[in-house]
Structure formats: structure tokens, C-alpha cells
Amino acid sequence: MSSGTPSPPTNPTRPPASTVPDRALADLVDHVRTRFYGLYRGVVTDNNDPNSLGRIKAQVPAVFGQIDSGWAMPCVPYAGDQVGIAFLPEVGSGVWIEFEGGDVSYPVWVGCYWRASELPPDVAPSVKVIATVSPFELKFDDDGGSLTITDNNGNTVTLDSSGITLSNGSEQVVVSSSSVSVNNGALQVT
């Protein structure tokens, strides 16, 4: 029998105590290396989802280089059976991409961003604009107290405190609480 400190008993089903934290740390490091958390800039390469779910494919250089992502699910503020907000970014648009659980196999597009020259005109803190490529536009002006709808031919409908104005550029009809005016008073109905 040797003199000195006795050895602790061994348990063949349990690894030595010093390797448990080391293995947990190694697992954590491996997990972090293979997961991508946070927002990544991407560019839409395909928006023609074969399943019509609002999905897109995007190039996300920081994650995939020049290879397209898989189909990225949309993250929208409101969705349900036959209801919701449905906006799909155009091919070439800048999008923010995240990955569900950090797993690159489950991309999610969570929004879009503008490049320097892409911001719609007349945008200010008091003016909210929804604009399409066509261009159709819906403009809310909180300071001016108006709502304007513009179609792709330049025709407008404006609702404000003075009434409703319909215009096609050269002609207009103004409906107020007391009258209807056509072409700046050429015809007036009171």
C-alpha cells in the first residue's frame, strides 16, 4: 500500500469531472460557429415563390457569399387565413435576413432597406408613403392633413380638410361640404 492521498473512487459510466465543462464549452463553441444570429444584409434574387407563401431567395454575402439562400419565409406584422399585409420586395431590392434559431437552413426575410438613392420622394417624419414600382402611391401627410392616392397615369384623389379633389393633371373636380367645382369653377354646383 502506498502512502499519500487516496484516489477518489472511479465511476466507469461518468467521464472524469474535468472533461465535462471542457466538452460543454466545446459544444457551445461548435454551436456558435455553425449558427448565424442577428440581421444580415441581402439582395433579392428571386421572388417567384412556387408555393405562393411570400418567400424570396436572396444573396447574403456575409453568410453565403454569392450563393442564393434557400426560400426565406416572410416576417410580417399581420397575417392569417385570407387576411394580412402582403408586400413582396422586387428582385434587386435590399432586404434584411435572419435565420430561425440561427440555422441557415431556415432563412427569414424581416424587412427591406433603401440604398442612398432609393428613398421615395417627399418622405419626412410627418409624411408616410407606400409606393410601388408602377408607380402607384398612397401618401399620408400628417402636417398637411391630407391623404393622396396617385395611380400610374398621374391621376390623383386627395382627401383633406377642404374636401375631395379628383385630378388627371389638366382637369379636376373638387367636392366640398357646400359645392362641387369642375375645372377651377368652370362649372359650379352649390
Give the location of each predicted region.
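Long terminal segments
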Residues: 177-190
